[in-house]
Swiss-Prot record:
Cytoplasmic-side segments: 1-92, 137-213, 316-356
Subcellular location: Prospore membrane; Lipid droplet; Spore wall
Keywords: Lipid droplet, Membrane, Sporulation, Transmembrane, Transmembrane helix
Membrane topology field: Multi-pass membrane protein
Topological domain ranges for the Extracellular compartment: 114-115, 235-294
GO cellular component, one term: prospore membrane
Residue ranges of the region described as Disordered: 322-356
Lineage of the species this protein comes from: Eukaryota, Fungi, Dikarya, Ascomycota, Saccharomycotina
Consequence of gene loss (knockout): A combined deletion of the LDS proteins RRT8, LDS1 and LDS2 fails to incorporate dityrosine and another yet uncharacterized component in the outer spore wall.
Listed transmembrane segments: 93-113, 116-136, 214-234, 295-315
Protein's UniProt keywords contain 4Fe-4S: no
Official protein name in the record: Outer spore wall protein LDS2
Taxonomy, superkingdom: Eukaryota
Primary role: Involved in spore wall assembly.
Length: 356
């Protein structure tokens, strides 16, 4: 047998063993996973890994949803606290102007390229059912659809201004180190890595793993896009609902990513754990902030105040975590005074047993 070290999947312990291999312990080699089945096992692991990851994410939601919902229900008011924090405060003003300008630019582009097509399509759909009411309803629906798409584009950008808002909030709340960390962030564009080299296009792994997974995800995203399209056609309620969904393109978790990514520098695996473990509070924040974002034009201002509200929630979590827990003191037992006794305390305590 070869003495070269094998990959982790090659070794096997008893399934009920709760501890890793001890020092000097010989691993048990699976008889079915020999060197001849090395490539077959790699292909199996390529399919097994995403299934295991999805299962772990589902278990994180299942184990923490109700506890997090009970402990973090106050987060639903924090978008409105962001508004009250921003009113009359000039520290956020220049950041709000930049976000609002970027919002208006996206809204104008969306209206220019999609409004005529969307309005015509909606009129054709609503006209047989609503008659003359189809024209104003299609107009209102087109505005809401454009607002929803604009929110997705603004929040879906790797936006350094959200991080700057966190820096202002941290400075106002006395968290100097975190504020300095936010101010030193610079925008770095994404680097797209090639999944396969040219030689990999002719490998067995490409045809058995990469290509099937590509089509699975492709049709899955097509299905999601089709469901969102049907939801957008629902008058008034549809676009507002999409803004409120936590897994939609404009989910509320985008407001918290600057802290976890730019300040804590979490990788994708840890960020995914944070998202699924706290799914309940992101859901509540998505619902509350999505209602504000659905207001046309003013939604561009509310995106900035929603970021302020998210930073206030992070400040609250930091202070709650750093504040030491004080155990409750036991209630003091009432003392029975002894009338006319000047004896020491010990003798007073036994006076009722041995009276003078």
């Amino acid at each position: 047998m070869s003495t070269r070290p094998q990959p982790d999947w090659y070794y096997h312990r008893h399934p009920y063993a709760s501890t890793p291999l001890a020092e000097g312990e010989e691993p048990q080699l699976l008889p079915i996973q020999d060197q001849g089945n090395h490539k077959k096992s790699k292909i199996w692991m390529a399919y097994k890994a995403p299934i295991v990851r999805w299962y772990k994410n589902a278990m994180l939601v299942k184990d923490n949803f109700w506890k997090d919902l009970e402990s973090s229900h106050q987060i639903i008011w924090y978008p409105y606290k962001g508004i009250s924090e921003s009113v009359g405060n000039s520290d956020y003003l220049h950041l709000f102007f930049l976000i609002f300008g970027y919002y208006l630019l996206n809204l104008l582009l969306i209206v220019a390229f999609t409004s005529i097509l969307a309005w015509s399509l909606l009129v054709c759909i609503y006209l047989p059912f609503l008659g003359l009411f189809a024209l104003p309803l299609a107009y209102m629906q087109t505005i809401l659809i454009s607002t929803t798409l604009c929110n997705s584009m603004v929040k879906g950008t790797d936006f350094v201004l959200f991080t700057r808002i966190y820096g202002v909030t941290f400075a106002r709340k006395g968290l100097t180190e975190l504020s300095e960390a936010c101010e030193t962030i610079s925008f770095t564009p994404f680097v797209y890595r090639r999944s396969h080299r040219l030689g990999g296009l002719f490998s067995k792994r490409f045809y058995l793993v990469s290509l099937p997974q590509f089509f699975i995800f492709f049709f899955w995203y097509i299905f999601i896009a089709f469901m969102f399209l049907l939801l957008l056609l629902v008058p008034i309620v549809g676009p507002i609902t999409i803004n409120m969904l936590p897994f939609s393109p404009g989910m509320g978790f985008y407001y918290f990513e600057p802290y976890f990514v730019d300040v804590l520098h979490l990788d994708s695996r840890k960020l995914s754990k944070v998202y699924y473990k706290g799914f309940a509070k992101w859901l509540l924040y998505s619902i509350s902030s999505g209602l504000l974002e659905s207001i046309p034009i003013l939604g561009g201002l509310f995106i900035g105040t929603n970021a302020v509200g998210a930073s206030l929630w992070i400040v609250k979590e930091i202070k709650d975590r750093d504040q030491p827990a004080v155990p409750p003191s036991p209630p003091a037992e009432p003392e029975e005074p002894t009338v006319g006794s000047y004896a020491p305390p010990i003798q007073q305590s036994i006076a009722h047993i041995n009276p003078p």
